[in-house]
């Protein structure tokens, strides 16, 4: 190992905790913000240029988009894990085969998604609760996204390999370029060309095409040690099997998230039609879907940077835990808790007391939707300030190699607690119960995470 690499590793056990946390968290925060922008920018410009019907259409497509992301994650993370191991073993031919097989799998996955999507898209959207008003809008948006599915899989999937080859800034730069392109193209296609909901879809696909082209260009450059090569793109079953097996655990949560969003969309439509009055523009169910689309965009923009901050602490916790520097492990946890809580308390206060101001830009011409979204945000975000308890605890278990406990804690908030409450509460509280399921799951996951963390910390002396 080089002296420089040794010094970098040793700094985990000697450098200032705040400095280390910020050093590793800032790139992760930027990466997460980039991902959040893809979600929030489309809905912002659609709200401005298309209206509430457009927001409802995009929101109905979200479970399918999450499924595509899960497939990309399965191949990208699974392939990259195996790729990194072979790099460490200096088995560069095998590493090249793994990289190229992953590239082929991402393309095949996208083609399969496009074909299946064309067949099942309309039945799925109806199952999620699409009405006669929202189905044409959602179908128009989703059909274009399916057409460009290959770019949605290649861009995030292959970016993992760039990081493993020692170019994290290059990977981040390509993500940022994609996000900035999306903002510019959304404004151009929706606000200037007036392409409506199709403009939002074409902006997303075009920006991902740009990101995919930049990422592919990295792998064909002369100075890239492991390139995309035709002769290594032929699928080898032993590698394909390992890639998929390694990729299933990280993609499983995303698949569960897709399922949860499908149940949520159905619940919003069903109980929105009961609890909300038809406005003439939107039915009660469509209004509930649009309101959730706005709330979810704002919540994602708040949560994803927090996730980046928390995930940035994992290598620091892992190194010091392995080195038995338990005082530094506890110091890292304390620092992370303080800043995560501080950030979330400010965000929670804004959600509670400035809800109207936060939702207004998404529906400038629909006061009823603004009112509904602000009401929903105050319920949905009621326990947001408690989220750091579960997130930091989960990150601790991930960093110390206890992946199953980490998966359990992440699953508590998104699946294990949320889905049962989502299915039960609306029977008693109608639409309010749909939005109340999330804060109850947030609080439950926080208490479970804290209990598990305190139990584990007692073992650290």
Model-derived segments and spans:
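Hydrophobic transmembrane alpha-helices of multi-pass small-molecule transporters
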Residues: 67, 182-186, 212-216, 301-304, ...
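Short alpha-helical transmembrane segments in multi-pass integral membrane proteins
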Residues: 1-25, 83-150, 192-248, 317-383, ...
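Juxtamembrane/transmembrane-helix interface segments of polytopic membrane transporters
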Residues: 35, 39, 43, 47, ...
């Amino acid at each position: 190992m080089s002296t420089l690499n040794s010094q970098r590793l040793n700094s985990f056990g000697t450098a200032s905790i705040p400095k280390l946390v910020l050093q590793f968290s800032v790139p992760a925060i930027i990466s997460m913000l980039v991902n959040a922008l893809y979600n929030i920018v489309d809905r912002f410009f659609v709200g401005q240029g298309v209206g509430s019907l457009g927001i409802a259409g995009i929101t109905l497509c979200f479970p399918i988009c999450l499924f595509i992301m899960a497939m990309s994650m399965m191949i990208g993370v699974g392939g990259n894990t195996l790729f990194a191991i072979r790099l460490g073993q200096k088995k560069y031919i095998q590493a090249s085969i793994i990289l190229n097989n992953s590239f082929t799998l991402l393309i095949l996955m996208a083609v399969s998604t496009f074909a299946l999507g064309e067949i099942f898209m309309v039945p799925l959207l109806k199952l999620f609760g699409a009405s006669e008003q929202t189905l044409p809008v959602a179908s128009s948006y989703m059909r274009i996204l399916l057409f460009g599915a290959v770019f949605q899989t290649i861009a995030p999937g292959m970016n993992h390999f760039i990081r493993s080859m020692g170019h994290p800034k290059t990977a981040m730069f390509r993500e940022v370029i994609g996000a900035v392109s999306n903002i510019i193209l959304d404004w151009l296609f929706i606000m200037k060309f007036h392409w409506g909901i199709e403009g939002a879809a074409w902006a997303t696909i075009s920006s991902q095409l740009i990101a995919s082209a930049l990422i592919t260009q990295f792998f064909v450059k002369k100075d890239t040690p492991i390139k995309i090569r035709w002769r290594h793109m032929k699928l080898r079953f032993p590698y394909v099997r390992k890639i998929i097996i390694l990729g299933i655990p990280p993609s499983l949560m995303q698949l569960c998230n897709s399922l949860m969003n499908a149940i949520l969309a159905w619940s919003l439509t069903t109980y929105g039609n009961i609890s909300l009055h038809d406005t003439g523009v939107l039915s009660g169910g469509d209004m509930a879907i649009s309101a959730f689309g706005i709330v979810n965009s704002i919540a994602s923009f708040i949560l994803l940077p927090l996730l980046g901050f928390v995930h940035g602490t994992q290598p620091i916790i892992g190194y010091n835990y392995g080195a038995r520097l338990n005082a530094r492990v506890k110091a890292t946890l304390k620092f992370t808790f303080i800043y995560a809580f501080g950030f979330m308390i400010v965000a929670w206060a804004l959600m509670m007391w400035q809800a109207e101001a936060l939702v207004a830009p998404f529906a400038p011409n629909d006061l009823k939707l603004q009112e509904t979204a602000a009401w929903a945000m105050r319920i949905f975000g009621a326990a947001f300030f408690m989220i750091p308890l579960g997130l930091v605890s989960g990150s601790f278990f991930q960093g110390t190699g206890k992946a199953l406990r980490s998966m359990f804690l992440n699953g508590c908030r998104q699946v294990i607690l949320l889905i049962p409450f989502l299915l039960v509460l609306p029977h008693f509280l109608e639409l309010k119960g749909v939005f109340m399921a999330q804060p109850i799951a947030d609080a439950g996951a926080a208490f479970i995470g804290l209990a598990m963390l305190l139990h584990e910390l007692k073992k650290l002396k």
